[in-house]
Design a protein with these regions (language model features):
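Conserved Rossmann-fold cofactor-binding substructure of NAD(P)-dependent oxidoreductases
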Residues: 64-94
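N-terminal Rossmann-fold cofactor-binding loop
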Residues: 42-46, 67-68
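Active-site-lining helix/loop region of Rossmann-like oxidoreductase modules
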Residues: 157-225
Length: 225
């Protein structure tokens, strides 16, 4: 089935969604692999989405309205894209409905979630349906996960057979702009962290219910980072 857009950035007026929109626009403007990609921005408010695009002089191929509280609007949105980049958080409250809509419309899904409870829940509840639909559900594509995953993969590749990397430690170092005054985190990141630490017990209990074959490796790594 033909799709209107290659990519929709959902939650484009949020802190992270706005940044993603700006970066994607810059990539598309430079040509290369992103040249000709039809990307759109999505969210609840046409006014806010249009204002954000105008503010940064962005040229998305479309503006799509959808709300995580309205399943029909989500399916209408996801059906128009090949891939949805979901930037609406905290994911434990707003993410699952988007995952469900993507599976229903056979749309690939990517997020930047760092919330183990949400990732585990999606694996437990939706992995089989996603596989049956041929849909990719890719979590944790952000700074707290990508360096760990790529770093571990790089390290493992340094051990040619019969060598084997059995353990790897990863450390993050963050550079802050010289003119920054104090450390800061966006409100959604703060709320996600509060609920994440507050729900550690529930996350552990959820993992005890996991079948032995459930692939919880990614979210286990997230807890350690």
């Amino acid at each position: 089935m033909a799709r209107d857009f290659d990519v929709i950035i959902f939650g484009a007026t949020g802190y992270t969604g706005e940044h993603i929109s700006r970066e994607l626009h810059a990539l598309a403007s430079k040509g290369g692999a992103w040249q000709g990609v039809a990307w759109a921005i999505g969210g609840r408010s046409q006014l806010k989405l249009s204002a954000m695009a105008s503010k940064h002089k962005l040229t998305p191929a479309g503006v799509v309205i959808a709300d995580t509280a309205d399943a029909a609007s989500l399916r209408s949105m996801t059906a128009r894209a090949k891939v949805v980049m979901n930037a609406t958080g905290p994911y434990r409250f707003y993410g699952e409905a988007v995952v469900e809509a993507c599976i229903a419309t056979k749309t690939d899904y990517v997020d930047l979630c760092g919330e183990p409870e949400f990732i585990d829940r999606c694996l437990l509840k939706h992995a089989d349906a996603a596989e049956a639909a041929g849909v990719l559900i890719v979590h944790a594509c952000a700074f707290d996960s990508i360096p760990a995953d790529i770093g571990c993969l790089f390290t493992a590749l340094q051990f040619p057979p019969p060598g084997l990397c059995a353990h790897a430690d990863m450390y993050h170092t963050f550079d802050v702009a010289a003119d920054a005054k104090g450390a800061a985190a966006h409100a959604t990141t703060f709320y996600a962290a509060v609920h994440g630490f507050g729900g550690v017990g529930a996350t552990r209990a959820q993992r005890k219910d996991s079948p032995p074959t459930c692939p919880l490796l990614i979210s286990c790594c997230l807890l350690a980072t």
